């Protein structure tokens, strides 16, 4: 297995991973062909040096996991960098095999390579198993996060 940056050819498998998730079923539009908006967004992410869309590829060259890392420069922490990890998914038939932990350990190492002082994430409150998983890895619920859905 290996981690690598996603390519345009990976996009269908990535969106499928996002759409098969319990909450993703409500917000993603997986189909063949994929809606053009996914390609437009992929190109923006791919061109941004502070964004990394990552895939986990099996020995059989199948995409079995994905995540997105964003590196954010802040004035706080004396000009520190925060890494944000989002959209962490492992294909259903590969769950409970330690791959989620490998993926997060890889994300931690990548954040350290990029000189981030903090790796942060959010997990929906409807995912108690995921929250316990992140806590087991050392993440702390140190802040109360809030979101506002906008009309766009």
Predicted regions: what is each one?
Residues 55, 62-71, 89:
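Conserved beta-strand in the GNAT
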Residues 22-41:
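Conserved GNAT-fold acetyl-CoA-binding loop/helix
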Residues 43-55, 84:
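A short helix-loop-beta-strand connector motif used in the catalytic cores of GNAT acetyltransferases and
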Residues 101, 113, 125-143, 148:
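Conserved active-site alpha-helix within GNAT-family acetyltransferase domains
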Residues 104, 111-123:
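Conserved GNAT acetyl-CoA-binding A-motif
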Residues 87-90, 96-109, 136:
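Conserved acetyl-CoA-binding loop-helix of GNAT-fold acetyltransferases
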């Amino acid at each position: 297995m290996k981690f690598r940056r996603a390519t345009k050819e990976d996009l269908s498998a990535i969106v499928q991973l996002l759409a098969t998730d319990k909450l993703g079923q409500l917000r993603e539009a997986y189909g063949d062909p994929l809606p053009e908006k996914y390609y437009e967004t992929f190109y923006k992410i791919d061109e941004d040096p502070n964004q990394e869309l990552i895939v986990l590829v099996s020995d059989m060259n199948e995409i079995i996991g994905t995540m997105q890392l964003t590196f954010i420069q802040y004035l706080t922490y004396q000009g520190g960098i925060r890494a944000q990890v989002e959209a962490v998914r492992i294909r259903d038939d590969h769950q409970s095999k330690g791959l989620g932990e490998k993926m997060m350990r890889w994300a931690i190492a990548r954040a350290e390579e990029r000189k981030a002082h903090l790796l942060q994430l959010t997990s929906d409150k409807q995912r108690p198993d995921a929250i316990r998983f992140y806590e087991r890895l050392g993440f702390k619920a140190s802040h109360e996060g809030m979101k506002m859905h906008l009309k766009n």
